Curated annotation (Swiss-Prot):
The modification Leucine amide is found at L59. It comes from the Eukaryota. One of its GO terms (biological process) is defense response to bacterium. Residues 1-20 form the signal peptide. It comes from Xenopus laevis (African clawed frog). PGLa and PGLa-H display a broad-spectrum of antibacterial activity against a range of Gram-positive and Gram-negative bacteria. PGLa also displays antifungal activity against C.albicans ATCC 14053. PGLa-H shows moderate antibacterial activity against the multidrug-resistant methicillin-resistant S.aureus (MRSA) but exhibits very little hemolytic activity. It is found in: Secreted. Expressed by the skin glands. Synthesized in the stomach and stored in a novel granular multinucleated cell in the gastric mucosa. Stored as active, processed peptides in large granules within the granular gland secretions of the skin. This is PYLa/PGLa A. Belongs to the gastrin/cholecystokinin family. Magainin subfamily. Residues 21-35, 60-64 form a propeptide. GO terms for cellular component: extracellular region. The keyword Transmembrane does not apply. The keyword Secreted applies.
Length: 64
């Protein structure tokens, strides 16, 4: 079960990293949108990390 959770977190981190990378051919008008998306992706990643920590703590308390 922990392997599945770990795999899910790794995939989420990789997706967030890929989404946060800016492309080299972006127009000046699109830069603002990309910055907004990058900010949202990093916030989503932080929230997902906090949820994962809470879930792992809850699972740890349940097992012991």
């Amino acid at each position: 079960m922990y392997k599945q959770i770990f795999l899910c977190l790794i995939i989420a981190a990789l997706c967030a990293t890929i989404m946060a990378e800016a492309s080299a051919f972006a127009d000046a008008d699109e830069d603002d949108d990309k910055r907004y998306v990058r900010g949202m992706a990093s916030k989503a990643g932080a929230i997902a990390g906090k949820i994962a920590k809470v879930a792992l703590k809850a699972l740890g308390r349940r097992d012991s």
